[in-house]
A protein has these predicted regions:
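Surface-exposed assembly/interface segments
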Residues: 1-452
């Protein structure tokens, strides 16, 4: 039988490849001693070293984190993130244990689930290439080989112990971040290791208030083109005016990081603010004037506030009349948080739109029709930014001239060199006007007497 293709040949090529857009609405909590591997009293002694290769977990609720074994400050930060309204969909928790060379733990008095009453605490940790475990009977630790030497009582505080290892399971005790031994030189490598395993996060925060760790995270963040970081700034520190994370990111003119000051312990304003604002489309929001759940407002004096504002810091305060909000919503360099986030988003959007355009075309000519195709796609990306609220709408100025929110400048054939054409290179210039948010209003009026 003859092949029908001799008469009617039909071939279909699928041009359906799409570049994936970046993630700009997911936070990550860098949690030393995260202990999120789901171990229990009945299983912690039989765990294997290969069970702990993952450095991250993705959560959709705080209950899931608690079920996995997270506790203490790490769990409080997760709860603050998910307590906002509307509640965020996703949170990443990174095992940031590499930032500590030794981790301090403190007995909580909470019973170990499923254990005899005599067992006051249990722990599992990784040291080198070994998994070790131990239990505490109220007097001493006992467990696998080497465990008793790895867990040393803190002479300065009863019920505290310094653990030499990466904690992967902990019950009956919690991590004490401020008393742990910091290894700030390992911070960048620790974040990079988490990122290499899972990169679908945007805004970093940490449960540690150690300044050297915060500075290292800020330095790493500033080197990224698609990441931001928020920090808790301990305003109660006696060295705040001369050495604080707010001052550090201000003095280094950092655009990718910002800090929220508080005098309260266990007040995770960073996680709360991230959870409140990351749910909003980049460009549609402001990070100022936001109410927060699961967070405590500070009672700063006007002098306190002016000191913080002078360093482009942020606060969460009670203004009376039921208004308890964040302010002013600025990064270390003084730019609005939402503007930095939007610009990262807009750059990613245009890059990925152009990539999708080119990989699905057999050829885009290096001529005026080809330039028009490229410019149209760039305008489409900018229009998406305008629709999102990050670029101002077109308007008519006082002279009656139309001012466009964005403009893509078409290159001419004469402007493109032969070398560019041979190499396939093309430069297209564009500009847009940012749509800033109103955060402060001065209403000035006059009270008059009729008849005068």
């Amino acid at each position: 039988m003859a092949n029908l293709s001799r008469l009617f040949s039909v071939k279909i090529g699928r041009q359906t490849t799409a570049a994936q857009y970046g993630v700009f609405g997911v936070g990550i909590i860098l949690a030393p001693g995260a202990a999120f591997f789901g171990l229990k009293y009945s299983t912690y002694e039989s765990a294997k070293i290969e069970n702990f290769n993952d450095l991250y977990r993705v959560y959709t609720s705080a209950d899931d984190a608690a079920s996995d074994g997270m506790s203490g400050d790490n769990l409080l930060a997760v709860q603050a993130y998910f307590s906002q309204s509307p509640s965020p969909d996703t949170l990443v928790v990174g095992d940031f244990s590499a930032a500590y060379s030794k981790t301090m733990i403190r007995l909580t008095g909470v019973p170990v689930a499923g254990a005899p009453a005599a067992i006051k605490a249990t722990i599992g940790y990784v040291k080198g290439s070994e998994y070790r475990y131990a239990k505490f009977n109220g007097t001493a630790w006992s467990g696998s080989a080497g465990a008793t030497a790895d867990i040393v009582a803190d002479s300065g505080a009863e019920g505290q112990f310094l653990v030499d290892g990466r904690i992967v399971y902990l019950e009956g005790a919690e991590v004490v971040h401020k008393s742990s031994v910091v290894l700030s030189a390992a911070v960048s490598q620790a974040i990079a290791a988490i990122k290499n395993q899972y990169n679908r996060f945007f805004m970093s925060m940490t449960t540690s208030r150690d300044l050297s760790i915060q500075k290292a995270i800020a330095d790493w963040t500033e080197s990224q083109i698609d990441k931001m970081a928020v920090f808790i700034d301990d305003y109660s520190s006696p060295t705040w005016a001369t050495d604080s994370i707010t001052k550090y990111i201000h003095d280094k003119n950092m655009a990718g990081s910002f800090a929220v000051s508080t005098k309260r312990e266990k007040n995770f304003l960073d996680a709360a603010l991230a959870g409140r604002c990351l749910v909003m489309q980049p460009g549609s929001e402001t990070w100022a004037l936001k109410t927060l759940n699961a967070a405590q407002a500070d009672d700063f004096t006007e002098t306190d506030y002016q000191k913080i504002q002078a360093l482009n810091g942020n606060t969460f305060e009670d203004y009376g009349s039921g208004i308890t909000v964040t302010y002013p919503g600025t990064c270390g360099d003084g730019e609005s948080i939402e503007v930095v986030r939007f610009c990262y988003w807009q750059a990613d959007r245009m890059q990925k739109d152009l990539a999708t355009l080119f990989v699905n075309r057999n050829k885009i000519g290096h001529d005026m029709p080809g330039y028009e195709v490229v410019c149209n796609k760039m305008e489409s990306s900018l229009k998406a930014g305008q629709t999102a609220g990050g670029i101002i709408e077109n308007f008519t100025d006082e002279n009656g001239d139309l001012i466009r929110g964005f403009e893509v400048v078409r290159p001419t054939m004469a402007e493109v060199s032969a070398t560019q054409r041979i190499k396939g290179d093309l430069t297209v210039k564009f500009k847009f006007y940012l749509r800033y948010a109103i955060k402060h209003v001065d209403a000035i009026g006059s009270a008059m007497t009729y008849g005068i």
